[in-house]
Amino acid sequence: MAETPRLLFVHAHPDDESLGTGATIAHYTAAGADVRVVTCTLGEEGEVIGERWAELAVDRADQLGGYRIGELTAALRELGVGEPCYLGGAGRWRDSGMPGTPKRRRQRFIDADEREAVGALVAVIREQRPHVVVGYDPAGGYGHPDHVHVHTVTTAAVAAAGAGDFPGEPWAVPKFYWSVFATRPFEAAVQALTPEDLRPDWSMPSAEQFTFGYADDHIDAVVAAGPHAWAAKRAALAAHATQVVVGPTGRACALSNNVALPILDEEHYVLVAGAAGARDERGWETDLLAGLEFGAAPRR
Protein backbone atom coordinates (compact mmCIF):
# COMPACT_ATOMS: atom_id res chain seq x y z
CA MET A 1 0.00 0.00 0.00
CA ALA A 2 1.34 3.43 -0.93
CA GLU A 3 2.37 5.70 1.91
CA THR A 4 0.02 8.61 2.49
CA PRO A 5 1.73 12.00 2.03
CA ARG A 6 1.73 14.11 5.17
CA LEU A 7 1.89 17.92 5.29
CA LEU A 8 1.94 20.28 8.28
CA PHE A 9 1.08 23.99 8.07
CA VAL A 10 1.98 26.29 10.98
CA HIS A 11 0.03 29.54 11.27
CA ALA A 12 -0.24 32.40 13.74
CA HIS A 13 -3.98 33.12 13.94
CA PRO A 14 -7.28 31.68 12.75
CA ASP A 15 -7.82 32.85 9.13
CA ASP A 16 -4.10 32.84 8.22
CA GLU A 17 -4.40 29.24 7.03
CA SER A 18 -7.13 30.24 4.57
CA LEU A 19 -5.69 33.56 3.38
CA GLY A 20 -2.23 32.29 2.48
CA THR A 21 -2.47 28.53 2.04
CA GLY A 22 -6.16 27.66 1.79
CA ALA A 23 -6.06 26.48 -1.81
CA THR A 24 -2.96 24.39 -1.14
CA ILE A 25 -4.51 22.73 1.89
CA ALA A 26 -7.71 21.94 -0.02
CA HIS A 27 -5.69 20.63 -2.98
CA TYR A 28 -3.81 18.11 -0.88
CA THR A 29 -6.71 16.99 1.29
CA ALA A 30 -8.73 16.31 -1.87
CA ALA A 31 -5.83 14.17 -3.10
CA GLY A 32 -5.99 12.08 0.08
CA ALA A 33 -3.00 13.53 1.92
CA ASP A 34 -2.87 13.78 5.72
CA VAL A 35 -2.88 17.55 6.19
CA ARG A 36 -2.71 19.18 9.61
CA VAL A 37 -2.81 22.83 10.62
CA VAL A 38 -1.24 24.14 13.82
CA THR A 39 -2.51 27.54 14.95
CA CYS A 40 -0.42 29.35 17.56
CA THR A 41 -3.01 31.73 19.07
CA LEU A 42 -6.77 32.26 19.19
CA GLY A 43 -6.52 35.62 17.41
CA GLU A 44 -7.95 37.54 20.35
CA GLU A 45 -6.62 40.91 19.15
CA GLY A 46 -8.23 40.75 15.72
CA GLU A 47 -10.17 43.76 14.45
CA VAL A 48 -13.83 42.79 14.26
CA ILE A 49 -15.77 43.61 11.10
CA GLY A 50 -19.21 45.15 11.53
CA GLU A 51 -21.50 45.53 14.51
CA ARG A 52 -22.85 41.98 14.69
CA TRP A 53 -19.81 40.69 16.60
CA ALA A 54 -18.46 44.04 17.81
CA GLU A 55 -19.07 43.26 21.49
CA LEU A 56 -16.67 40.30 21.26
CA ALA A 57 -13.70 42.61 20.69
CA VAL A 58 -10.79 42.94 23.08
CA ASP A 59 -11.84 46.38 24.31
CA ARG A 60 -15.35 45.14 25.12
CA ALA A 61 -16.18 41.58 26.24
CA ASP A 62 -12.78 40.20 25.12
CA GLN A 63 -14.46 37.00 23.92
CA LEU A 64 -13.24 37.03 20.33
CA GLY A 65 -10.70 34.24 20.78
CA GLY A 66 -13.27 31.71 21.89
CA TYR A 67 -15.60 32.68 19.07
CA ARG A 68 -12.83 32.27 16.52
CA ILE A 69 -12.37 28.63 17.55
CA GLY A 70 -15.72 28.03 15.90
CA GLU A 71 -14.72 30.01 12.83
CA LEU A 72 -11.48 28.06 12.46
CA THR A 73 -13.28 24.75 12.93
CA ALA A 74 -15.71 25.65 10.14
CA ALA A 75 -12.94 26.90 7.84
CA LEU A 76 -10.85 23.77 8.29
CA ARG A 77 -13.91 21.66 7.54
CA GLU A 78 -14.28 23.50 4.22
CA LEU A 79 -10.61 22.77 3.47
CA GLY A 80 -10.96 19.08 4.30
CA VAL A 81 -9.00 19.18 7.57
CA GLY A 82 -10.10 17.80 10.93
CA GLU A 83 -10.37 19.63 14.24
CA PRO A 84 -8.11 22.61 15.01
CA CYS A 85 -4.75 21.97 16.66
CA TYR A 86 -3.54 24.84 18.83
CA LEU A 87 0.12 25.04 19.78
CA GLY A 88 0.38 24.13 23.45
CA GLY A 89 -3.41 23.75 23.62
CA ALA A 90 -6.17 26.26 22.89
CA GLY A 91 -5.44 29.53 24.66
CA ARG A 92 -1.92 28.67 25.83
CA TRP A 93 -0.54 31.84 24.22
CA ARG A 94 -2.45 34.99 23.43
CA ASP A 95 -2.47 36.91 20.17
CA SER A 96 0.25 39.55 20.61
CA GLY A 97 -1.42 42.17 18.44
CA MET A 98 0.45 44.64 16.28
CA PRO A 99 3.41 46.65 17.64
CA GLY A 100 2.21 48.91 20.45
CA THR A 101 -0.61 46.62 21.56
CA PRO A 102 -0.59 46.54 25.39
CA LYS A 103 0.08 43.34 27.29
CA ARG A 104 -3.00 41.52 28.55
CA ARG A 105 -3.61 39.12 31.41
CA ARG A 106 -2.33 36.06 29.58
CA GLN A 107 1.12 35.56 28.14
CA ARG A 108 1.47 36.79 24.58
CA PHE A 109 2.89 34.47 21.95
CA ILE A 110 5.86 36.76 21.37
CA ASP A 111 6.68 36.45 25.09
CA ALA A 112 6.41 32.66 25.12
CA ASP A 113 9.26 30.65 26.57
CA GLU A 114 10.97 29.62 23.35
CA ARG A 115 11.90 26.15 24.55
CA GLU A 116 8.31 25.46 25.58
CA ALA A 117 6.90 26.68 22.26
CA VAL A 118 9.51 24.84 20.20
CA GLY A 119 9.00 21.69 22.23
CA ALA A 120 5.25 21.84 21.68
CA LEU A 121 5.75 21.99 17.91
CA VAL A 122 8.43 19.30 17.98
CA ALA A 123 5.88 17.03 19.65
CA VAL A 124 3.41 17.64 16.81
CA ILE A 125 6.08 17.01 14.16
CA ARG A 126 7.25 13.79 15.79
CA GLU A 127 3.68 12.55 16.16
CA GLN A 128 2.59 13.30 12.58
CA ARG A 129 6.00 12.80 10.91
CA PRO A 130 5.21 15.19 8.04
CA HIS A 131 7.00 14.98 4.71
CA VAL A 132 6.47 18.73 4.26
CA VAL A 133 6.29 21.55 6.83
CA VAL A 134 5.13 25.02 5.79
CA GLY A 135 5.83 28.14 7.88
CA TYR A 136 6.55 31.84 7.32
CA ASP A 137 9.57 33.78 6.10
CA PRO A 138 11.77 35.76 8.55
CA ALA A 139 9.62 38.88 8.14
CA GLY A 140 6.47 36.91 8.89
CA GLY A 141 4.99 37.95 5.58
CA TYR A 142 3.58 41.39 6.32
CA GLY A 143 5.47 41.78 9.61
CA HIS A 144 2.94 40.94 12.33
CA PRO A 145 4.94 40.10 15.49
CA ASP A 146 3.19 36.73 15.87
CA HIS A 147 4.03 35.80 12.28
CA VAL A 148 7.67 36.65 12.88
CA HIS A 149 7.63 34.50 16.01
CA VAL A 150 6.00 31.64 14.10
CA HIS A 151 8.99 31.77 11.77
CA THR A 152 11.39 31.57 14.72
CA VAL A 153 9.55 28.73 16.44
CA THR A 154 8.90 26.70 13.28
CA THR A 155 12.48 26.98 12.07
CA ALA A 156 13.82 25.85 15.44
CA ALA A 157 11.28 23.03 15.73
CA VAL A 158 12.00 21.61 12.28
CA ALA A 159 15.70 21.50 13.16
CA ALA A 160 15.10 20.07 16.64
CA ALA A 161 12.63 17.42 15.50
CA GLY A 162 15.39 15.55 13.70
CA ALA A 163 17.87 15.80 16.59
CA GLY A 164 18.04 14.15 19.98
CA ASP A 165 16.51 16.85 22.17
CA PHE A 166 12.92 16.75 23.48
CA PRO A 167 10.85 13.61 24.11
CA GLY A 168 9.82 11.30 21.29
CA GLU A 169 11.42 9.57 18.34
CA PRO A 170 13.28 12.02 16.09
CA TRP A 171 11.86 12.86 12.67
CA ALA A 172 13.91 14.67 10.03
CA VAL A 173 11.47 16.70 7.95
CA PRO A 174 12.25 16.03 4.26
CA LYS A 175 11.07 19.43 2.94
CA PHE A 176 10.53 22.76 4.71
CA TYR A 177 8.91 25.72 2.93
CA TRP A 178 7.96 29.31 3.62
CA SER A 179 4.55 30.44 2.43
CA VAL A 180 5.07 33.74 0.57
CA PHE A 181 3.24 36.10 -1.76
CA ALA A 182 4.58 36.41 -5.30
CA THR A 183 4.58 40.02 -6.51
CA ARG A 184 3.86 39.54 -10.21
CA PRO A 185 0.89 37.13 -9.85
CA PHE A 186 -0.59 39.26 -7.06
CA GLU A 187 -0.34 42.46 -9.08
CA ALA A 188 -1.83 40.73 -12.12
CA ALA A 189 -4.73 39.46 -10.02
CA VAL A 190 -5.32 42.96 -8.65
CA GLN A 191 -5.36 44.40 -12.17
CA ALA A 192 -7.88 41.75 -13.22
CA LEU A 193 -10.41 42.77 -10.56
CA THR A 194 -13.45 44.65 -11.81
CA PRO A 195 -15.96 46.85 -9.99
CA GLU A 196 -18.34 43.89 -9.93
CA ASP A 197 -15.85 42.01 -7.73
CA LEU A 198 -15.84 44.70 -5.03
CA ARG A 199 -18.21 45.95 -2.40
CA PRO A 200 -19.01 49.69 -2.58
CA ASP A 201 -16.94 50.54 0.51
CA TRP A 202 -13.79 48.74 -0.67
CA SER A 203 -10.69 50.34 -2.16
CA MET A 204 -8.02 48.83 -4.37
CA PRO A 205 -4.61 48.07 -2.81
CA SER A 206 -1.80 50.47 -3.56
CA ALA A 207 1.80 49.52 -4.26
CA GLU A 208 2.74 50.96 -0.86
CA GLN A 209 0.43 48.46 0.85
CA PHE A 210 2.11 45.47 -0.79
CA THR A 211 5.83 45.67 -0.18
CA PHE A 212 6.43 42.13 1.09
CA GLY A 213 6.04 40.19 -2.15
CA TYR A 214 8.70 37.99 -3.76
CA ALA A 215 10.06 38.28 -7.30
CA ASP A 216 9.64 35.29 -9.60
CA ASP A 217 13.31 34.34 -9.39
CA HIS A 218 13.02 33.99 -5.60
CA ILE A 219 10.06 31.61 -5.79
CA ASP A 220 10.69 27.87 -5.64
CA ALA A 221 7.21 26.34 -5.82
CA VAL A 222 3.64 27.08 -6.81
CA VAL A 223 0.48 25.14 -6.12
CA ALA A 224 -2.16 25.91 -8.74
CA ALA A 225 -5.58 25.12 -7.35
CA GLY A 226 -8.28 23.54 -9.41
CA PRO A 227 -11.88 24.74 -9.21
CA HIS A 228 -12.64 22.54 -6.18
CA ALA A 229 -9.72 23.86 -4.11
CA TRP A 230 -10.39 27.47 -5.10
CA ALA A 231 -14.04 27.13 -4.09
CA ALA A 232 -12.98 25.54 -0.80
CA LYS A 233 -10.63 28.47 -0.13
CA ARG A 234 -13.43 30.96 -0.72
CA ALA A 235 -15.76 29.05 1.60
CA ALA A 236 -13.07 28.86 4.28
CA LEU A 237 -12.48 32.60 4.08
CA ALA A 238 -16.21 33.22 4.42
CA ALA A 239 -16.21 31.08 7.58
CA HIS A 240 -13.93 33.68 9.23
CA ALA A 241 -16.75 36.21 9.22
CA THR A 242 -15.44 38.36 12.08
CA GLN A 243 -12.26 39.00 10.09
CA VAL A 244 -12.95 38.55 6.37
CA VAL A 245 -15.67 39.58 3.93
CA VAL A 246 -15.84 37.75 0.60
CA GLY A 247 -16.96 39.93 -2.30
CA PRO A 248 -20.05 39.44 -4.46
CA THR A 249 -18.32 37.41 -7.18
CA GLY A 250 -16.04 35.41 -4.89
CA ARG A 251 -12.95 36.72 -6.67
CA ALA A 252 -11.89 39.13 -3.92
CA CYS A 253 -12.11 39.60 -0.18
CA ALA A 254 -11.28 42.30 2.33
CA LEU A 255 -10.22 42.51 5.95
CA SER A 256 -11.28 45.24 8.38
CA ASN A 257 -9.36 47.89 6.40
CA ASN A 258 -11.73 47.42 3.42
CA VAL A 259 -8.84 47.00 0.99
CA ALA A 260 -9.71 44.49 -1.72
CA LEU A 261 -7.50 41.41 -1.95
CA PRO A 262 -7.78 38.99 -4.86
CA ILE A 263 -8.56 35.44 -3.76
CA LEU A 264 -5.68 33.74 -5.50
CA ASP A 265 -6.01 30.31 -7.06
CA GLU A 266 -2.21 29.95 -7.01
CA GLU A 267 -0.10 29.98 -3.84
CA HIS A 268 3.66 30.37 -3.76
CA TYR A 269 6.48 29.00 -1.66
CA VAL A 270 10.20 29.24 -0.99
CA LEU A 271 12.05 25.98 -0.30
CA VAL A 272 14.14 26.44 2.84
CA ALA A 273 15.43 22.93 3.49
CA GLY A 274 15.36 19.70 1.53
CA ALA A 275 15.95 18.79 -2.09
CA ALA A 276 13.78 20.28 -4.81
CA GLY A 277 11.96 18.01 -7.21
CA ALA A 278 11.20 18.59 -10.87
CA ARG A 279 10.81 22.24 -11.87
CA ASP A 280 8.87 23.80 -14.74
CA GLU A 281 10.09 26.34 -17.29
CA ARG A 282 9.86 29.09 -14.65
CA GLY A 283 12.17 27.15 -12.37
CA TRP A 284 9.30 26.36 -9.99
CA GLU A 285 8.15 23.10 -8.51
CA THR A 286 4.42 22.58 -9.07
CA ASP A 287 4.01 20.10 -6.22
CA LEU A 288 5.30 20.52 -2.65
CA LEU A 289 5.83 16.76 -2.60
CA ALA A 290 8.02 16.84 -5.73
CA GLY A 291 11.13 14.72 -5.37
CA LEU A 292 9.61 12.55 -2.64
CA GLU A 293 8.74 9.02 -3.67
CA PHE A 294 5.07 8.15 -3.27
CA GLY A 295 2.78 5.80 -5.05
CA ALA A 296 -0.61 7.09 -6.09
CA ALA A 297 -2.16 8.89 -3.14
CA PRO A 298 -5.51 7.48 -2.06
CA ARG A 299 -8.48 9.58 -3.15
CA ARG A 300 -11.41 10.47 -0.95
From Swiss-Prot:
GO molecular function: N-acetylglucosaminylinositol deacetylase activity; zinc ion binding
Documented EC number(s): 3.5.1.103
Domain of life: Bacteria
Pfam families in alphabetical order: PIG-L
Keyword terms, alphabetized: Hydrolase, Metal-binding, Zinc
Cofactor binding comment, as recorded: Binds 1 zinc ion per subunit.
Its biological purpose: Catalyzes the deacetylation of 1D-myo-inositol 2-acetamido-2-deoxy-alpha-D-glucopyranoside (GlcNAc-Ins) in the mycothiol biosynthesis pathway.
Family from the record: Belongs to the MshB deacetylase family.
Protein name according to UniProt: 1D-myo-inositol 2-acetamido-2-deoxy-alpha-D-glucopyranoside deacetylase
Organism: Mycobacterium avium (strain 104)
